[in-house]
Swiss-Prot record:
It catalyses: uridine(34) in tRNA + AH2 + O2 = 5-hydroxyuridine(34) in tRNA + A + H2O. It comes from Buchnera aphidicola subsp. Schizaphis graminum (strain Sg). GO terms for molecular function: oxidoreductase activity, acting on paired donors, with incorporation or reduction of molecular oxygen. The keyword Oxidoreductase applies. Catalyzes oxygen-dependent 5-hydroxyuridine (ho5U) modification at position 34 in tRNAs. Keywords: Oxidoreductase, tRNA processing. This is tRNA uridine(34) hydroxylase. It comes from the Bacteria. The gene is trhO. The active site is at C201 (cysteine persulfide intermediate). The lineage of its organism: Bacteria, Pseudomonadati, Pseudomonadota, Gammaproteobacteria, Enterobacterales.
Length: 312
C-alpha cells in the first residue's frame, strides 16, 4: 500500500524517463456518467492500479462519474482494461476510445483528481437531468445527415479545437470553455427548436451532456455522435465508409492534434501558410496556444511574437 497516492517526481525527471523508455504505448480515452458514492476511495483505487501498470495521463473522478485520457504500456493494456471493467458494475460495458495515433510523448505524469463534475458545465438548475440525452448516431447516419440541408450540425468544442478541424458547415459556438458554450448555444440556436440537431465533440462526453441540456431547454430532435469524433472515425473505417470530417482533431495532451484528413483548413498565425500545428509560446510568461508552421517555429524560436522572442 502506498502512503502517498500522488506523484512525487518532477515533470522534468518523468519526461526524461519516458523518452528513454522504449516500450510501446497506446493512448485511450473514456468516460462514464454513473453514481460514485465514495469518490475518495474510488480515486485512490484508480491511482493505485494505474500506478502499478505505469499508466500516465489525466483522470477526473466525481460523484457523477469518471473522465480519463491516458497512455498505457501495450503489454499492460488488457490488465488495465480488465481492472476498469471490474472496478464498478456500471463499467462492465465501458467503451474505451483508442486514439488515432499513439505516441509515448502524449503524457509525462499520472494525475487522478476528484472534481465537482467530470466536465465543467456550469449548470446549477436542480431540475436538470443529465441522463435524458439525445439519440446516439454512428458514422453511416452521420454521413447521411451531413447531406441533409434540414439537419444542423453543432460543434461542442472550444474555438481553438474547431479551427483546425470540423465537419463541413458545422456551426461553431465560439467560446473558450464548455460552460460558456452551454449558455450560448441555447441563445444562438433558439430558432431551431423544431429542427434536427446533431451535436459532436472529441470523445462524446461534452456532446452527451450538451444533448441533455438542449432537451431540457425545449429542443425536440437532438442527436449526438456515439463516442464523438474518435468513435466516428473508428466506426467509418470499420465499415469502409468515407470520413467526412475535415482537418485535424485537437487533443488535450502533448501531441496537440491527430490528423484525420489530408486537408489542412487552418493557417499559421505568423505567415498565413496552411498549418494545423499547435504550439505554446516558448516565452514562459506568455505561453499562448497558437498555430505555427515549422518554418516560423525556427524563425521565431517557437514564440508567438518578436517581443516574446526578444525576452527569452
Amino acid at each position: 500500500m502506498m502512503s502517498n497516492l500522488c506523484n512525487r517526481i518532477s515533470k522534468k525527471e518523468l519526461k526524461k524517463k519516458i523518452l528513454m523508455n522504449e516500450e510501446s504505448r497506446i493512448v485511450v480515452s473514456f468516460y462514464k456518467y454513473f453514481l460514485i458514492k465514495n469518490t475518495k476511495e474510488y480515486r485512490d483505487r484508480i491511482y493505485q492500479n494505474f500506478y502499478k501498470y505505469n499508466v500516465l495521463g489525466r483522470v477526473y473522478v466525481s460523484d457523477e462519474g469518471i473522465n480519463a485520457q491516458i497512455s498505457i504500456p501495450v503489454k499492460f493494456y488488457f490488465f488495465v482494461k480488465n481492472f476498469l471493467y471490474n472496478s464498478d458494475l456500471e463499467l462492465n460495458n465501458l467503451f474505451i476510445n483508442k486514439s488515432l495515433s499513439n505516441h509515448k510523448k502524449a503524457f509525462w505524469v499520472l494525475s487522478v483528481k476528484i472534481k465537482k463534475k467530470i466536465v465543467n458545465d456550469g449548470i446549477t438548475n436542480p431540475l436538470f437531468n443529465f441522463k435524458k440525452v439525445g439519440i446516439y448516431i454512428k458514422s453511416r447516419q452521420v454521413n447521411m445527415m451531413l447531406s441533409d440541408r434540414n439537419v444542423i450540425f453543432i460543434d461542442m468544442r472550444n474555438s481553438y479545437e474547431y479551427e483546425i478541424g470540423h465537419f463541413p458547415n458545422a456551426i461553431e459556438i465560439k467560446s473558450q470553455t464548455f460552460r460558456e458554450q452551454l449558455k450560448k448555444v441555447i441563445q444562438i440556436m433558439h430558432y431551431a427548436k423544431n429542427k434536427k440537431i446533431v451535436m459532436y465533440c472529441t470523445g462524446g462526453i461534452r456532446c452527451e451532456k450538451a444533448s441533455a441540456w438542449m432537451h431540457f431547454n425545449g429542443f425536440k430532435y437532438v442527436y449526438h455522435l456515439k463516442n464523438g469524433i474518435l468513435g466516428y472515425v473508428h466506426d467509418a473505417n470499420k465499415n469502409g465508409l468515407p470520413i467526412l470530417f475535415q482537418g485535424s482533431n485537437f487533443v488535450f495532451d502533448n501531441r496537440m492534434s491527430e490528423k484525420i484528413s489530408d486537408k489542412i483548413i487552418s493557417f499559421c498565425k505568423q505567415c498565413d501558410k496552411p498549418s494545423d500545428r499547435y504550439v505554446n509560446c516558448n516565452f514562459n510568461l506568455c505561453h499562448l496556444l497558437f498555430i505555427q508552421c515549422k518554418d516560423c517555429t525556427i524563425k521565431f524560436k517557437k514564440c508567438c511574437s518578436k517581443y516574446c522572442m526578444q525576452h527569452l
